[in-house]
């Protein structure tokens, strides 16, 4: 059984939402990036709350032990190609979804950020859902192409090639009062 999330989650009317559900699709509304909308939206946007309520409802219904596919669909939440115009709404839901993915290993959570909703987009989403091994959690669809977020190996230069602090400069450390921030501050002070 597939369940497509709408505003009924916000309103709490999800009685039919139980452990027979095997696939959940959560779609973040698109077309909300106008300046006037942005000004008001911080007080009224319920998308992240809606996703939180969805996860809470699934856990209350003891679905956290079930193998469930959860797909989050956003609209241009990230600049993938370097020249995308973005709509930041949905990026908070993606962040929350990636956290839930780490916490509840039975759920295969996949985030899919698209520039347009077309038949090609739907086909790409279905293909990813069908063939994905779950190795990646974030996909983007731009101009008919699928992009996959992945970590790349990089070489770290040896210490001798890193430019040292300038003895006469002023260093401002923002945040990080413990851990790395404290060590950096102590190192700077020693110099």
Regions found by a protein language model. Give the residues of each.
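Conserved NAD(P)H cofactor-binding loop of Rossmann-fold oxidoreductase domains
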Residues: 25-33, 75
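Glycine-rich nucleotide cofactor-binding loops and adjacent beta-alpha elements
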Residues: 36-159, 169, 189-190
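Short alpha-helical segments and helix-capping/turn motifs at coil-helix boundaries
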Residues: 9-13, 53-57, 183
């Amino acid at each position: 059984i597939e369940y497509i999330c709408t505003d009924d989650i916000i309103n709490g009317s999800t009685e039919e939402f139980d452990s027979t559900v095997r696939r959940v699709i959560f779609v973040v509304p698109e077309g909300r990036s106008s300046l006037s909308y942005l000004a008001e939206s911080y007080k009224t946007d319920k998308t992240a709350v809606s996703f939180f309520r969805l996860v809470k409802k699934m856990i209350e219904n003891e679905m956290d032990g079930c193998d469930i596919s959860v797909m989050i669909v956003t609209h241009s939440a990230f600049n993938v190609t370097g020249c995308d115009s973005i709509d930041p709404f949905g990026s908070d839901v993606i962040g929350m979804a990636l956290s839930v993915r780490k916490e509840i290993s039975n759920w295969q959570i996949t985030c899919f950020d698209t520039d347009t909703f077309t038949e090609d987009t739907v086909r790409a989403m279905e293909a990813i859902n069908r063939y994905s091994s779950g190795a990646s959690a974030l996909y983007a669809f731009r101009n008919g192409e699928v992009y996959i977020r992945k970590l790349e190996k990089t070489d770290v230069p040896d210490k001798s090639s890193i430019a040292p602090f300038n003895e006469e400069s002023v260093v401002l450390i923002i945040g990080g009062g413990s851990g790395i921030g404290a060590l950096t501050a102590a190192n700077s002070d020693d110099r």
